[in-house]
Amino acid sequence: MIYQNREEFKNANMFGEGAPNDGYARYFTGNSYLNPLVAPGQAPLFLANVTFEPGCRNNWHIHHAEKGGGQMLICTAGEGWYQEEGKEPVSLHEGSFVYIPAEVKHWHGAKADSWFSHISLEVPGEDCRNEWLEPVTDEVYGRL
């Protein structure tokens, strides 16, 4: 469901908007918010609800790992996009699930006309690290 009104979206976003995602703001076009569901190191998996304002998206990035690793997204509210390099974008909505293996260049974010949130799970592995790359240009995003 498309949410243009922030208050309506907040009511639908069952895992909460969280705080401005200032620590990662340089890797996003637009404003995002982060609500950790477990504290880092508290559980074997780090889980957080990430919220994107309309038009917000993260840069292209890769989750590297020597073994295992990657990322999973569980879409919780609103509508967004996911795209792997060289592939067509995938429309996301509440209930969508995306598994992103390690070493896959990709990006994800909100549609231009809707707030969007997903739970992000970092898949355990060996020597896991993220490589943040170039922004998704307005030209590329505008064609969606």
Language-model features: locations:
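Short beta-strand His + acidic residue motifs that chelate non-heme Fe in jelly-roll/DSBH
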Residues: 59-61, 82-83, 100, 105-112
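Short acidic-glycine-tyrosine-enriched beta hairpin
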Residues: 86-103
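Short hydrophobic/aromatic-rich beta-strand segments that constitute the beta-sheet cores
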Residues: 34-35, 82, 118
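Short, conserved beta-strand element in jelly-roll/cupin
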Residues: 49-53, 64-82, 121-124
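A short hydrophobic beta-strand segment most commonly corresponding to one strand
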Residues: 72, 99, 113-132
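A short, N-terminal "cap"/entry segment at the start of jelly-roll beta-barrel domains
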Residues: 1-46, 129-144
